[in-house]
Amino acid sequence: MGLIWLLLLSLLEPSWPTTGPGTRLRRDAGGRGGVYEHLGGAPRRRKLYCATKYHLQLHPSGRVNGSLENSAYSILEITAVEVGVVAIKGLFSGRYLAMNKRGRLYASDHYNAECEFVERIHELGYNTYASRLYRTGSSGPGAQRQPGAQRPWYVSVNGKGRPRRGFKTRRTQKSSLFLPRVLGHKDHEMVRLLQSSQPRAPGEGSQPRQRRQKKQSPGDHGKMETLSTRATPSTQLHTGGLAVA
């Protein structure tokens, strides 16, 4: 009888943990690809490197494009708005990545609903960023946007560094795949210079140095006047034309 009970327990054992991991997978992955459920708090400073070899950058003028070089406008702050939904802000431009109702990417000077993107993990290890507000049906690019539409509009940069319109994008295209890169040494230097230049008040720190240089200049007429007023004739020692108290 003891052997029979052991066999029954061994058959029931594998079924116990299946409910836990199964629910975990369904909670972490919504539809295709995974969702960053753990994000929140402080923003992540990253560079979004597209599979087309361009870094996504946001300009102060509101333009969005890709850059092959090390640009300060490609340093971004990715902040979690909700579970799987992020807002992308340019650190140096101060603008938010946004997509309008025509599927065009632009850099907005203020945060709005067009600045929210659904961040998902692609099977190849890249990330995709789809507009949370706009999407289209499966009937074609010219279809009207519907609340129950299925195909999202993705952030995309083509092989020439130009953004593609949302209704022309697919999640499997190289132009829609981005790899969040950690900032390098040069990027950290630019961020440090930006942070150190912001809190400084205008006109402070540089004037005292200039005043010291003016006082230390030899042969200055103003210096001779100050020395003559401070020193008395009885305590002056003349060496080489300079008065020392």
Curated annotation (Swiss-Prot):
Residues 226-238 have a biased composition (Polar residues). Induction: By integration of mouse mammary tumor virus. Keywords: Developmental protein, Differentiation, Endoplasmic reticulum, Glycoprotein, Golgi apparatus, Growth factor, Mitogen, Nucleus, Proto-oncogene, Signal. Pfam families: FGF (PF00167). GO terms for biological process: cell differentiation; fibroblast growth factor receptor signaling pathway; organ induction; otic vesicle formation; positive regulation of cell division; positive regulation of cell population proliferation; post-anal tail morphogenesis; semicircular canal morphogenesis. InterPro entries: Fibroblast_GF_fam, IL1/FGF. GO terms for cellular component: cytoplasm; endoplasmic reticulum; Golgi apparatus; nucleus. Glycans are attached at N65. Residues 137-181, 195-245 are annotated as: Disordered. Glycosylated. GO terms for molecular function: growth factor activity. The keyword Transcription regulation does not apply. Belongs to the heparin-binding growth factors family. Interacts with FGFR1 and FGFR2. Affinity between fibroblast growth factors (FGFs) and their receptors is increased by heparan sulfate glycosaminoglycans that function as coreceptors. This is Fibroblast growth factor 3. It comes from Mus musculus (Mouse). The lineage of its organism: Eukaryota, Metazoa, Chordata, Craniata, Vertebrata. The gene is Fgf3.
